Amino acid sequence: MTAGRIIFLNGTSSSGKSSIARELLDVLDDGVFFHLAVDNFNAMRTKRVLRPEELDTALRRTRMGFHRSIAAMAEVGNDVVVDHVLSEPWRLLDCLSVLRPEDVLFVGVHCPLDELTRREQARGDRPSGLAAHQYDLVHRHGDYDLECDTSTASPRECAERIKDFLPRLPRRTAFARLHDRYLTDHDGPGVFDQGPPSAQV
């Protein structure tokens, strides 16, 4: 059975990941793609108020389950668009440990902080300051196959460029490089060191 392809969008809250994912489902005409978003997994959790230690445990388990759900979908041949926020190093390491590196197109979704703040205030469904808190964390591993800036390109434009890049995904993907750096080469650079430049969108 041929494994499915994974388009992995990583960026802060309000950076435009979900909008790009929706456009990707519309423009991708080679295969059947599914949009898996970490926010949707969080929304499935019980609504009762949890103690801080309960919430921390629940969130970690939710994200670990999310990562393994991505892997399970792709393993049986489903193509997947992933919408995630890698704001903690362990999330990236866990994804590297469960996803096949050669199947992942890793896309960095960027947006200037002032625009993120404006979007966050306009949407009104996110805690104030969430994007600012995540801003210096989500991209610190520094290596992608492709990057886009949603302040200069529309979600549709980003999706079209991702679609165009997908057939040209190099054999040694960003996930392969990161896997070697963090899970194989124990003497290599730290999790937040910069890697080689990726294609710019």
Residue ranges and their predicted role:
Residues S14:
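Walker A (P-loop) phosphate-binding loop of P-loop NTPases
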Residues K17:
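Conserved lysine of the Walker
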Residues R22-A71:
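Conserved substrate/cofactor phosphate-moiety recognition/catalytic segment
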Residues L99-R119, C148:
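Conserved phosphate-donor/acceptor-positioning beta-strand/loop module used by diverse small-molecule
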